[in-house]
Regions:
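Tryptophan-anchored aromatic micro-motifs
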Residues: 50-87, 158-210, 285-304
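N-terminal accessory/assembly segment that mediates macromolecular interactions
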Residues: 82-176
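Extended lipid/amphipathic-ligand handling interfaces
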Residues: 90-91, 118-121, 148-152, 183, ...
Length: 306
């Protein structure tokens, strides 16, 4: 196939909030992109229809992402090529209100995601940009760098566009998705340690593999610990969670990994975000989502229901 761009248009609703409507042409083009190597491909999810979860009222000064026409902190969800995409925008500066961090999980399989991360400039305006976006691919562990932009084409709709230049082994890539706020998260509820405190058991994903029934414990003071290892000898050390900046219902997370022969993040510090929503799983009431990355973008994710 030539290196000309292909564009795939999908009509989508956010994850768990509605059904996909995909045209036959979209499916045909998706098959062509899968079958042909090289070149630049553009995959786009169109403006999703109204979500099926009623938005909860938001108390100022927290900005309501359902009614805002600017890029604001929060959790946003969509479906792309039939798979979940979750984006988290979190302030990272107490002095610069326009600065934030983006973390995003793109699931190409039911459970284990690719991880995007980067510093945002332009929060509070209609458009924010990332010049240092990293893309850590599940399974292969390939790390790529690129750029991204976040815009709000209409109230309650976050458009994310990411771009990567070609490498010797991979073609250039442009990817766009539209997402709605995750209304299972009461954004203006204070991020209290008592919400995240306790034992969580779920799926720990780290690109080269995963662990089901991974156990993580958060103390009443925000200390995070686990007796389990991943990738043979990666161990969580000096873990902590604390309320994020801006009074939103997000947590800042961090932990260190000691030096270990087989560990892909050995001798590294990881930082990221966590949040607790209502759980869609039968018999469960809470869901924890956790993402943490190294300075260069390699990372892990953890999802647990209790």
């Amino acid at each position: 196939m030539s290196s000309s761009s292909l564009k795939i248009n999908l009509q989508a609703t956010p994850t768990g909030l509605g059904a996909w409507r995909v045209s036959f042409l979209s499916l045909t083009l998706a098959a062509l992109v899968t079958a042909c190597g090289g070149g630049t491909s553009t995959t786009a999810a169109l403006d999703p229809s109204a979500p099926g979860v009623t938005p909860l009222p938001i108390t100022p000064p927290v900005v309501n992402p359902n009614t805002s026409t600017t890029v604001t902190p929060g959790v946003y969800t969509a479906l792309l090529s039939g798979k979940e995409v979750t984006s988290i925008v979190m302030r990272n500066s107490s002095t610069n209100s326009a600065s934030a961090q983006l973390y995003a999980l793109q699931f190409s399989a039911p459970f284990d995601p690719d991880i995007y991360a980067g510093s945002l400039s332009g929060i509070g305006s209609n458009s924010a940009t990332i010049s240092n976006l990293t893309y850590f691919q599940n399974v292969s562990g390939t790390l790529r760098t690129g750029s991204a932009s976040l815009t709000v084409p209409s109230a309650g709709l976050l458009k994310t566009t990411v771009s990567y230049s070609a490498t010797p082994t991979e073609g250039a890539r442009d990817l766009t998705w539209f997402a709605n706020p995750d209304n299972r998260l009461k954004l203006d509820t204070p991020a209290l340690l008592e919400t995240i405190e306790g034992k969580w058991v779920g799926r720990w994903s780290y690109a080269y593999g995963y662990i089901d029934n991974f156990s993580l414990t958060v103390s009443d003071t925000g200390v995070v610990s686990s007796s389990m290892t991943f990738q043979s000898d990666c161990q969580i050390s000096n873990g902590s969670v604390s309320p994020a900046l801006g009074g939103v219902n997000l947590f800042s997370v961090s932990f260190a990994v000691p030096n270990a022969t087989q560990c892909f993040v050995r001798s590294q510090n990881l930082t990221g975000v966590a949040y607790v929503t209502s759980s869609p799983a039968s018999g469960k009431t809470q869901r924890l989502q956790w993402i943490a990355t190294t300075a260069d973008g390699r990372g892990v994710s953890f999802r647990a229901d209790r």
